[in-house]
Amino acid sequence: MTSLNYKRLAAFLMAFLVLIVDGTRFRAEAASRTRSESAGGLWAHNNLVAWMVTPPWDAKARGPEERVQMLEKLGFKNYAFMPHDKDILTYDAEIEALRRHGINLLAWRFYLDADDPVAKATLETFKRHNVHPRLWVSQSLKGMNLPRPHGKMSAEEQHQLLMQLRREDLTKAPQELRVKQEADRINSLVKLAAPYGIKVALYNHNGWFGMMDNQVAIVERLKQLGVTDVGIVYNFSHARDELHDDTLNFPELWKTIKPYVVTVNITGMQTDGDLVYPSQGDSEFDMMRTIERSGWRGHVGLIAEKGGDAEMTLRNYLVGLDWLAVELKHPGAGGPHPFPVVRDASGRHNY
């Protein structure tokens, strides 16, 4: 082969290699654009809320500054805080760290009743810092027989205790009376929080209070009392348990609750209660599709409830959510599942 032919062959191979590299780069950039073209959309990262990233869900037990630095690194613009009794002395530090890093304190989990001195003290903290997180309120812990064992409870013991509390909660009072009692309790919190510019939302957790029909009944009762701005926080992680299963009729349920929902917290859905990442479960895809097609607009929370290092948990939740968002927009465009698919005992998986 002549020198000229060698040069021609080398030039051809180089051009072919460039085409391969450029093609690979083009496909990667196209995938990236697909993931980011919905910026400003429902599943966009700037619409997400980091939730349940405090200990014990964060194995690294980060303090306020470390925690907020982590959120900033991951790109979160909104944060919902899960307080514990021992954290009250760190509330100021938490809020100040969020302000330094430009992250919005969107919500604050609130277990307290209006007559609890800590409730007013917490609101005074918000006033001092000029922040207005929405209070995510679940069932009252007042009167609940919550044991405080010296040692850790096993997973089975925790499960049995939770089931016991759920059953007791269901039989507290006749339905009409229970709705009135809960509406009165929430109304007291609304009145306490209103002078501080703070609003309230019902948080579906467990038991009677965590069932959507009951929460809607409470909201409607509040409307009769002249209270019209109480919303609902809907949690995928509490969409089903041994007492109910929202996934069986979610499209119909969503039509009912959509007008009240202010935030949806996303996770992977499993019938056995195991915590899995978005895209690993059996129902989150259909539920997200129902929500998206309904035109609902609100914040979307990602939960580090799975445990371990909260940063890694949130990263994996972002990966799973991004994959689902692409699949919702262009079925098949997301590529392989980012995590192993987990099926229930019947082998069910819906996408």
Regions found by a protein language model. Name each.
Residues 104-105, 112-232:
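Active-site acidic/histidine proton-transfer and metal-coordination neighborhood
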Residues 1-6:
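N-terminal secretory signal peptides that target proteins for export/translocation
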Residues 55-63, 79-93, 109-120, 142-147, ...:
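Acidic-and-aromatic substrate-binding clefts and catalytic sites of carbohydrate-active enzymes
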Residues 76, 103, 197, 261, ...:
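A structural motif
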Residues 31-49, 65-66, 155-163, 183, ...:
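Histidine-acidic metal/acid-base catalytic patches
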Residues 10-22:
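Bacterial N-terminal signal peptides
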Residues 26, 31-133, 152-156, 227-229, ...:
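N-terminal pre-domain/capping segments
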Residues 80, 106-107, 134-136, 201, ...:
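Conserved beta-strand positions in the central sheet of alpha/beta enzyme cores
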